[in-house]
Amino acid sequence: DESLHFDYLLVASGCENRISDRAENVLNLQDFAASAGSELLMPLLESNHQSEQSISVVGGGATGIQFLFEIKQFLSRKKSKATLRLIHSGEQVLEQFPRGFDTYVQSRMQELNIAFYPNTYYRGQQSNTILLAEKHTQKHIELSSGLTILFLGKSQRTPYAANAFGQILIDQTPLPNIFVAGDCSVYRSVGSNTLTAQSAVRKGKLVAHNILRHSGLPGLLEPYLHPDLGYVVSLGSADAVGWIGTENALITGLPALTLKELVEAQYDLLLAG
């Protein structure tokens, strides 16, 4: 053990990826970060058992949904007859977003013949079979799956509570020289606490400024008031669903893709300062 003296401490430990046991024919987000998607998918499509080709995507959050539609588009380009399905533990997809996201996405899945298994838990993979369990009855299900791709989301540790200035609270008392930012924090303020890059970056910039202010002009700290700018989930290269400005104004299709570019441009500007 070692003790370090500090003037200010910033905790920004974030969230961990949910980890599942790796098995044959199973991929996750890290695999796609390390290799091109086509390199990962083509071995399945080039197999001789055309009638048995099937891909299972596990996880109906934003990442899983965006990969699901990109994979469907890739299969269409390759004129593949491989079947595609989504496994999700919840009743609806994109449950963290406003109502309307789920119905639009699920209607597009139906149009594209993507099978949907809601309220279903992933148990594992054995060779070319995915092992599932029905959420309410615990009934075990086995389906053919030549490739299973896991997008299990983030696992948030017990978050640190903070006041509106980003100072950690212990028994409702702020620690003046210890700040927290990112996904591991919940601010007691009107600002957004969603687990998104937007919120994490804005909290980080705020506490950086507040540390400088506190070290020079005690008491003149800035509160965290930033709302979400918007959020767009892409559904392939020609479709999307999202909102910007107000959560009640749902936008779909090509206009939503345009908004996605605007939101990402705003995020890039935010990172640039």
Put a short name on every predicted segment.
Residues 199, 203-273:
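C-terminal, flexible cofactor-proximal segment of oxidoreductases
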Residues 25, 83, 113-115, 177, ...:
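Conserved beta-strand segments of alpha/beta enzyme cores
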Residues 10-11, 149:
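N-terminal Rossmann-like NAD(P) cofactor-binding module of classical short-chain dehydrogenase/reductase
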Residues 11-74:
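Glycine-rich dinucleotide-binding loop and its adjacent helix/turn
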